[in-house]
């Protein structure tokens, strides 16, 4: 048996397709992974053994930098948050959920706004507002419908593993098809009853694009903060981190404490009210969630 190091590019029906040295190997996971309740993920760097391209075994998963649950991908560098301006309507709350989740996983976010061409002039003011708020925080915001927008996005891909996420029905599959027409991914219809897109993507696969790898992923429109402790939340807001050194209390949660610099900057208009209100809502969600009890093994 030959021992090799590679990366899982696709997982399907119990098989893991591992890319190594220009070849793709079909492998299975050894039974001891199941016994240890470890599941190999797309994006994992692995050690595996194989004598041919169809009968390999994954032996070891190398340490992960991060992992996402939805979609199940490991070692992600860049998260493109695709947000629709209309149908479904734009939501500051949802965008901030995605950004907080990415910051927590140490994944660089890029904000991509779709359906900008459907807006009238008053609605376009919101695009300007979004750009002002988030570019000031250091986030890239792409907001146009032409070839230039996809070109702007492509410059982020080289040497990175990129995941697309965002509102269901916001146009993630459409966007990926524009970037790489050979993908021919199914695009979502908007559900009349929910006002949200129906999920069209079924399994995750890493596709080599522009000297990087891109995962096509389901478009979930709700994110919860199951893993995060309340004290971690303020650290995921860059503007809070910058202000916190001037708060009266070192572990200030920017809620009820006196002498809070974050609250002062919100009142002064330096920190966006929408960001602070969303922070308070997320904080309440974390504090009110039921404890997760792990079963004894």
UniProtKB/Swiss-Prot annotation:
Protein location: Cytoplasm
Keywords assigned by UniProt, alphabetized: Cytoplasm, GTP-binding, Hydrolase, Metal-binding, Nucleotide-binding, Ribosome biogenesis, RNA-binding, rRNA-binding, Zinc
Binding positions (GTP): 114-117, 166-174
Domain CP-type G: residue ranges: 65-223
Gene3D superfamilies: Nucleic acid-binding proteins, P-loop containing nucleotide triphosphate hydrolases, Probable gtpase engc, domain 3
E.C. designation(s): 3.6.1.-
SUPFAM superfamilies, per the entry: Nucleic acid-binding proteins, P-loop containing nucleoside triphosphate hydrolases
Coiled-coil region(s): none
One term of GO molecular function: rRNA binding
Binding positions for Zn(2+) per the UniProt entry: 247, 252, 254, 260
Entry's Gene Ontology BP terms: ribosomal small subunit biogenesis
Cofactor list: Zn(2+)
Record note on quaternary structure: Monomer. Associates with 30S ribosomal subunit, binds 16S rRNA.
Function: One of several proteins that assist in the late maturation steps of the functional core of the 30S ribosomal subunit. Helps release RbfA from mature subunits. May play a role in the assembly of ribosomal proteins into the subunit. Circularly permuted GTPase that catalyzes slow GTP hydrolysis, GTPase activity is stimulated by the 30S ribosomal subunit.
Protein name per Swiss-Prot or TrEMBL: Small ribosomal subunit biogenesis GTPase RsgA
Organism for this UniProt entry: Enterococcus faecalis (strain ATCC 700802 / V583)
Recorded name of the encoding gene: rsgA
């Amino acid at each position: 048996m030959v021992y090799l190091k590679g990366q899982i590019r696709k997982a399907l029906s119990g098989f893991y397709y591992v890319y190594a040295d220009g070849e793709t190997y079909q492998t299975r996971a050894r039974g001891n992974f199941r016994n240890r309740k470890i599941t190999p993920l797309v994006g994992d760097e692995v050690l595996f053994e194989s004598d041919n391209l169809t009968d390999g075994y994954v032996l070891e998963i190398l340490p992960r930098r991060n992992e996402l649950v939805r979609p199940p991908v490991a070692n992600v560098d860049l998260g493109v948050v695709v947000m629709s301006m209309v149908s479904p309507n734009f939501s500051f709350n949802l965008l901030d959920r995605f950004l907080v989740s990415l910051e927590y996983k140490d994944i660089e976010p890029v904000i991509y706004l779709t359906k900008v061409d459907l807006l009238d002039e008053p609605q376009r003011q919101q695009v300007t507002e979004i750009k002002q708020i988030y570019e000031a925080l250091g986030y890239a915001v792409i907001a146009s419908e032409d070839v230039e927008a996809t070109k702007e996005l492509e410059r982020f891909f080289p040497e990175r593993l990129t995941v697309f996420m965002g509102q269901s029905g916001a146009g993630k599959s459409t966007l990926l098809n524009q970037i790489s027409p050979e993908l021919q991914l199914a695009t979502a219809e908007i559900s009349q009853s929910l006002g949200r897109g129906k999920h069209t993507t079924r399994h995750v696969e890493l596709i080599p694009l522009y000297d990087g790898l891109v995962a096509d992923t389901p478009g979930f429109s709700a994110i919860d903060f199951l893993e995060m402790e309340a004290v971690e939340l303020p650290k995921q807001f860059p503007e809070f981190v910058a202000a916190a050194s001037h708060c009266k209390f070192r572990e200030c949660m920017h809620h009820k404490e006196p002498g809070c610099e974050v609250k002062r900057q919100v009142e002064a208009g330096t920190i966006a009210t929408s960001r602070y209100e969303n922070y308070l809502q997320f904080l309440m969600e974390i504090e009110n969630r039921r404890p997760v009890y792990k079963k004894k093994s």
